[in-house]
Amino acid sequence: VAIDGLPTFDEWLSLAFSRFRNHTKSNDHFLSFINLTESLYAEIKTTYPETFLLHGDLHHENILRDDAVGWVAIDPKGVIGPKIIECGRFIQNFIEDEIPSATSLGDATDKEIMLILEERLKVFNNVTGFDQHHLAMVTFIDQVLSTCWSMNSGQVVGLRKIKLIKNLLNDV
């Protein structure tokens, strides 16, 4: 699918990562995550070569229930990429909302976070039919991209969630 004026997911990754490499130059550890992300995304594109118009920011707070029309996705970014990419943001966002004792991700234990991620992978596998390992891959890809955007804008960002999601790649 080619739609004039809309970016591709490839472009999102390329722009964010080249900006990080050329300007942010924060740390080698995060660069290793970028390198892994590029490798994982190449595998995703090979496995899922067909592209679609995606929302680009599909997560819990961007899906609302409207009494007149039913469920509505709001705040679309519009990006072209493999369908499976859309799952990553939903899987990795708002984990703390499912942990009763946590008001932020920092309040949750690694085990609690991993249990939520593993459950979400199972649910998305059951609903979409996408392979759990591929779902873990796109979750990692999305988290690294989101973190890169934050770092490129000068925010101080922890790498804990990236490290935990990376562990999923070995577990599923």
What are these regions (language model features)?
Residues 1-10, 121-134, 139-145:
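Conserved ATP-binding subdomain of kinase catalytic cores across diverse folds
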Residues 2-56, 66-67, 126:
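An alpha-helical support segment within catalytic cores of ATP-dependent transferases
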Residues 5, 26-30, 133, 154-161:
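Residue-level recognition of alpha-helical structural elements
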Residues 56-58, 140:
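Short, well-ordered beta-to-alpha junction loops that form the rim of enzyme active sites
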Residues 145-172:
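ATP/Mg2+ or Mg2+-diphosphate-binding catalytic cores
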Residues 61-63:
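Hydrophobic residue at the +6 position relative to the catalytic HRD Asp in the kinase catalytic loop
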Residues 20, 24, 95-98, 148:
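Short amphipathic alpha-helical interaction patches enriched in hydrophobic/aromatic residues
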